[in-house]
Regions:
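Short, structured coil segments at secondary-structure junctions
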Residues: 106, 478-479, 536
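Extracellular/periplasmic envelope-modification machinery, especially enzymes
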Residues: 350-503, 507-510, 521, 549
Length: 549
């Protein structure tokens, strides 16, 4: 297949994307819309895959499909497999509780259908009260892999039938609209959004926007020189597009209905505009994104994506409480992510190595020496046998863990899920008739009768996360007129719509107790906004409980 030329400023855009994704998981209160950055990768994938297929078809009248797939999947497979071996070996040695159900996670990821498997078993991208798997982020690679396989075949069929690349543009636009519509229709407000977040059908619009742009504005056209006045306009438009994206990344929450009913589609359209503007050399933003730090990160964006989630999930499961000196914990995780990603980059991008137990590896290679150089900061001879021996040892440990891994539901997690589900159902029932509720006032052990009577008649609103849900029964037993508003993984900055709804239902009482902070920290500005939305006339109390996640 014809090799598509690399766009240096778009590498810089990849850097911005992976930075946003990582900080969404490390500091979600700082960048609550960072999850939207995956759309950048989807759009760039659609852009370059479409450009490559059209270019080869126009030059040769056909597509070397087998060669195309081999090249694409070779770049994905070996770094992916190496990451999974290292992480599984680590889990086997140090965090054996995460071996539960590990086999289907690995098989679905290597088989490139992880996103649909997660949907089928009800895995949630947004639940944070326990670590489900260090491989949860691999849904992303499965979606991209499915696009790699299917879209070129669709394009070949269209080109063979209509002999005009504009049919690809029309098809891409139509499919993007259908996909966005499917996301909006399948999303159920108030329920977990993982189905529409993971689905290839509901994320297709981002790829299609990239594909449409590739037909309308191929990179060759974007390289054409323009007058300085046009360049200034491009810069102004680029700054405006990045400003809009900045607002989206800082304000579009994963819990909002708007996000899935048009918001994510609009975000992808805006990213598409930013891609075209960024790629043009006359745009000043293009010059900024050519800086070496952006290029360094952008060229390693795939390895950074592979490693960030295992590091974050395993570190936070091990440390448990990162609220004490959070800056230090963030720095440690960033260093680990960068180091592991750089090792992978040196081995698989610079050295083009294959893991030493695949079909292309030969025993004689073990005793050869290869020169390793690059941004690790040294040059010299790297003994292949050390690499091979270490890889085989890690593989054996990982295989041992896989053999020992059990299937089934974590008993503690299952009990907590059932308790929370029951509490949510009861919470809705409680809130429907909170003001008219009447029940016998029983004595409560440890509380004086006077206190029991006062608590029973107190008008209190409780707002919180799964911690609140887990104790809602006990709260209502004591506070007979309470309104309880809880949700799994809720964070303080996600409460704007909740407060507005409580006000609309006239259930925001003069006393408000807040159970938030277990799922992450928040900024002073977010706290001030929260207090303002509640109202300064209210009596406001905060309770935060640190629990193992």
């Amino acid at each position: 297949m014809t090799v598509q030329k690399r766009s240096v400023p778009l590498d810089g855009m990849r850097a911005l994307a992976i930075i946003a994704i990582i900080f969404y998981h490390l500091m979600p209160h700082v960048l609550p819309g960072g999850y939207l950055a995956v759309n950048i990768f989807f759009i760039l994938t659609g852009f370059f895959v479409t450009a490559s297929v059209i270019k080869e078809y126009s030059e040769k009248g056909k597509l070397a499909y087998k060669s195309y797939l081999s090249r694409r999947f070779h770049k994905l497979f070996f770094p992916l497999l190496s990451m999974m071996i290292v992480v599984t070996a680590y889990i086997t040695l140090f965090q054996r509780g995460l071996l539960l159900n590990l086999r289907p996670w690995i098989l679905s990821s290597l088989g490139m259908f992880n996103n649909w498997w997660q949907i089928s078993v009800g895995a949630s991208y947004f639940e944070q009260f326990y670590v489900q798997s260090p491989f949860m982020h691999l849904w992303f690679l499965s979606v991209i892999s499915q696009f790699y396989i299917i879209w070129p075949l669709v394009m070949l069929l269209l080109l063979a039938l209509y002999k005009d690349k504009r049919i690809i543009l029309y098809t891409a636009v139509l499919l993007s609209l259908f996909s966005a519509l499917a996301m909006g229709m399948l999303y159920v407000p108030g329920e977990d959004a993982s189905r529409v977040y993971y689905g290839t059908d509901t994320r297709l619009f981002s790829f299609m926007i990239g594909s449409a742009l590739s037909v309308v504005w191929p990179l060759e056209r974007l390289d054409e020189p323009v007058p300085k006045q046009i360049g200034r306009r491009l810069t102004l438009a680029g700054l405006l597009s990045y400003a809009v994206l900045g607002v989206m990344f800082s304000s579009m929450l994963d819990s909002q209905a708007f996000t899935y009913r048009g918001g994510m589609f609009l975000n992808s359209v805006m990213i598409g505009i930013a891609v075209v503007l960024t790629a043009h050399p006359a745009n000043f933003i293009s010059k900024i994104l050519r800086f070496k730090p952006f290029q360094w990160i952008g060229r390693r964006s795939f390895l950074l994506y592979l490693w960030y989630y295992p590091v974050v999930s395993l570190y936070q499961a091990k440390v448990v409480d990162t609220s004490v000196d959070p800056g230090r914990h963030v720095l440690i995780q960033l260093v680990l992510i960068l180091c592991l990603s750089e090792i992978g980059y040196q081995l698989f991008e610079k050295e083009r190595r294959k893991i030493p137990f695949g079909p292309s590896w030969r025993l004689g290679d073990t005793f050869s020496k290869r020169k390793l150089s690059g941004s690790l900061g040294f040059t010299g001879h790297f003994p292949e046998k050390i690499f091979a021996t270490g890889s085989v040892c890690l593989l054996l440990i990982a295989l041992t863990g896989l053999v020992q891994a059990k299937s089934g539901e974590n008993a503690d997690v299952q009990e907590l899920r059932e308790q929370i589900a029951a509490s949510q159902s009861k919470m809705e029932e409680i809130n429907r008739d909170a003001s008219a509720r009447s029940r016998a006032i029983n004595n409560i052990e440890g509380l004086e009768r006077e206190v029991v009577l006062f608590a029973h008649d107190a008008d209190i609103t409780f707002i919180g996360d799964s911690v609140l849900l887990s104790v809602s029964d006990q709260l209502v037993t004591i506070f007979g007129r309470a309104v309880v508003e809880g949700a799994v993984s809720r964070q303080l900055y996600q409460t704007t719509e909740v407060i507005a709804d409580l006000k609309k239902r006239e259930q925001l009482h003069d006393t408000v107790v807040v159970f938030l902070g277990s799922n992450g920290t928040f900024t002073r500005t977010q706290m001030e906004r929260f207090i303002k939305e509640i109202g300064t006339s209210k009596d406001l109390f905060f309770l935060t409980t640190n629990v193992p996640r």
